[in-house]
């Protein structure tokens, strides 16, 4: 017997990753979890321009990107009063993820997860539930 993914009330989700494969993988995983209001950006500067118009409930952000890394992007998102939840993603070690989580939290952002890539679908589903709870809190 297979279990179908439990649909979650769709959130507005902004994906930010410079890797097209990772963006596609995450978008597919989110769609499988019932998340249909997803926008993807491969450039942090473009994502900053998207924030005020799209107003995502959740931002899923890679840390290691060219031009502007995830930490700088998150600092600027915090300065622009981004009020949604954040999931940090990285291929780097756990210490880097923890440091990034601490820095982003210090900027006033709500970090609900810091995950090593690729994030397992079950973990992503749990984090989406947390983001939905934050949205209604």
Spans of features found by a protein language model:
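Active-site residues of response regulator receiver
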Residues: 17, 62
């Amino acid at each position: 017997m297979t279990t179908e993914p439990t649909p979650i009330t769709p959130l507005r989700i902004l994906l930010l990753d410079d890797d097209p494969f990772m963006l596609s993988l995450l978008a597919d995983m989110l769609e499988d979890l019932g998340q249909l209001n997803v926008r993807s950006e491969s450039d942090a500067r473009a994502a900053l321009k998207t924030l005020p118009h799209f107003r995502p409930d959740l931002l899923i952000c890679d840390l290691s990107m060219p031009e502007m890394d995830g930490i700088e992007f998150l600092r600027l998102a915090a300065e622009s009063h981004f009020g949604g939840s954040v999931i940090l993603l990285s291929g780097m070690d756990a210490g880097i993820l923890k440091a990034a989580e601490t820095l982003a939290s210090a900027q006033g952002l709500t970090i609900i997860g810091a995950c090593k890539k690729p994030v397992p679908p079950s973990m992503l589903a749990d984090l989406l539930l947390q983001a939905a709870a934050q949205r209604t809190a």
